[in-house]
């Protein structure tokens, strides 16, 4: 008996980075070998169970040794809430994540009224919802992204200026922009201090724990904490931008999508999935009803049916005679 062992990986992109391709290959192989998805999301389990109900089309994988779904029959707008990032020949996509509750509210509103404009949908989805937090600095980039599918969203770290018992000020960082690595951020601040490009910093310490992030920058007594902070915003990733480029495949072709487009195509996808699932379940129910009707006919004429089977030379002859005698048909 051969066994495959899978190494557990704890991945936190804020702390450090691993090769995403390795992780994806590992999870894909684990799924193919065990049929157990590496997720606790209930929607994932329901999604996988619906694959067997002809809800989506299948295609051959890269070496044509098995079939894989073209898309998943998901019940959640994953592209909108999770975002996406990728590069292809001559194009790239970079989609921001959004809040699930806001996205659901916007989708429900759109289903109720297909004539809603982007401005109406923006009453439900206010802005991207980055998992690492931060503060969106300015709204024009968000508005551009929602209206055109392309925009530059500026995100600042969430900071507080505290004063200790000795009267010394501290810059406390509680949240950092999306896709910024905490370790690299601290290294960049240290480098600026060593190169004397930023003055007034006495010490920097990472006090983060399971309760949350806390990077503490001690300010010298003769320095102004606001001046230091503004320099850090300008010279480090404490302030960074997320360039939105909403390119996604629509019917196999790349398209630039605004907010309404993203919601529209998700609703259309769900509509198709529900119809195909219902058609599959109806066909299965009709097959079952057909069998039960046949069983009822045979049970009502059980002795004669048994005699026909005994008198037949082989199963094929028995099947033919039963069908002719009782008006049965194949599925």
Features from the language model and the residues they span:
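Conserved phosphate/anionic-ligand binding catalytic regions in large, soluble enzymes, centered on
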Residues: 20, 29, 74-101, 327-331
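A short, flexible low-complexity segment enriched in Lys/Arg and Gly/Pro that occurs
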Residues: 55-75, 109, 137, 304-305
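Conserved glycine-bearing catalytic or ligand-binding loops at nucleotide- and phosphate-handling centers
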Residues: 40-43, 91-153, 183
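Short beta-strand elements
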Residues: 77-80, 153-163
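Short, hydrophobic/aliphatic alpha-helical segments
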Residues: 65-85, 312-317
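Long, charged, helix-rich clamp/arm modules that form nucleic acid-engaging surfaces
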Residues: 1-42, 129, 165, 177-178, ...
């Amino acid at each position: 008996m051969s066994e495959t062992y899978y190494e557990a990986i704890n991945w936190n992109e804020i702390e450090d980075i691993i090769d995403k391709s390795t992780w994806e290959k590992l999870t894909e192989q684990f799924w193919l070998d065990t049929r157990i998805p590496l997720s606790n999301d209930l929607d994932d389990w329901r999604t996988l169970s619906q694959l067997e109900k002809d809800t989506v089309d299948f295609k051959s994988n890269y070496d044509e040794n098995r079939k894989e779904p073209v898309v998943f029959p998901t019940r959640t707008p994953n592209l909108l809430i999770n975002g996406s990032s990728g590069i292809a020949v001559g194009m790239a996509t970079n989609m921001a994540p959004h809040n699930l509750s806001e996205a659901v509210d916007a989708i429900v509103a759109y289903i109720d009224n297909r004539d809603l404009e982007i401005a109406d949908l923006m009453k439900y989805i206010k802005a991207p919802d980055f998992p690492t937090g931060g503060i969106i600095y300015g709204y024009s980039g968000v508005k551009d992204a929602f209206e055109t599918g392309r925009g530059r969203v500026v995100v600042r770290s969430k900071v507080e200026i505290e004063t200790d018992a000795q009267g010394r000020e501290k810059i406390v960082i509680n949240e950092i922009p999306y896709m910024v690595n905490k370790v690299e951020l601290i290294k960049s601040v240290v480098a600026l201090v060593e190169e004397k490009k930023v003055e007034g910093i006495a010490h920097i310490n990472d006090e983060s724990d399971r309760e949350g992030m806390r990077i503490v920058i001690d300010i010298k007594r003769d320095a102004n904490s606001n001046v230091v902070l503004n320099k850090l915003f300008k010279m480090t990733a404490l302030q960074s931008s997320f360039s939105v480029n909403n390119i996604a495949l629509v019917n196999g072709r790349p398209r630039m999508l605004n907010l309404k487009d993203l919601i529209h195509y998700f609703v259309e996808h769900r509509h198709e999935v529900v119809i195909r699932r219902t058609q599959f379940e109806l066909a299965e129910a009709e097959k079952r009803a057909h069998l039960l009707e046949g069983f009822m006919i045979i049970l009502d004429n059980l002795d004669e049916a048994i005699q026909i089977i005994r008198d037949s030379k082989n199963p094929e002859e028995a099947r033919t005679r039963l069908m002719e005698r009782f008006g049965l048909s194949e599925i």
